[in-house]
Amino acid sequence: DRLYFEPLSAESVIEIYKKENSNGKVLGVYVQFGGQTPLKIAKQLEKSGINILGTSTEAIDLAEDRDLFSNTLNELKINQPKNGISNNIDDILNIANHIGYPVLVRPSYVLGGRAMEIAYDNKSLESYAKTAMMVSTNNTILIDKYLENATEIDVDLIRDSKGNVFIAGIMEHIEEAGIHSGDSACSLPPFSLNKSMENKITKWVSDIANKINVIGLMNTQLAIKDNALYVLEVNP
């Protein structure tokens, strides 16, 4: 085994791949173990001739593209908070007013909850949106109805190419929904979920993994408000 201390960029990975491939055929690379950064460069790696192991770039897009993912949840008849997506300030304000405040605003394809904020009116939303657009890959902003006082749930699973799903853990956040998972504490096993809700969560995340055709790891973030379950996002 070898360990490389290099920037996690397409250029660095391609150079390392070429070097390793010269010593013997490399089957491909996994992009599921480093958060958003490797997911963002997956298509560049694939275009350069590198085989992406595990979840395909098409499946990654199904999870990461808000419109595609929203349509997927609708097809599965899975609840999601009211939401919209835009790269125009006026449209963002119109979407928020249609959804109803408070809203959660965040840029697409970023890691660590960067520029994620809760807006309670047009003035704060406009300010947050401008900041979020600066760090978004394509100036695209996601606007979700913020579920106040909701319980947030994190689920990690593994799925193989034959469709077998193993739930690694259902974790219940100590803080209410809206605090980024990297900044919050959680309980494993969950401390307030009944068996019926756990079964529903298990079915939903398994259905999503099968629909998207995840091969390998998948993280799902959900919220429970007034005993209703919602899917917030999926990270393959």
Residue ranges and their predicted role:
Residues 2-220, 224-236:
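N-terminal beta-alpha lobe that positions the nucleotide/phosphoryl donor
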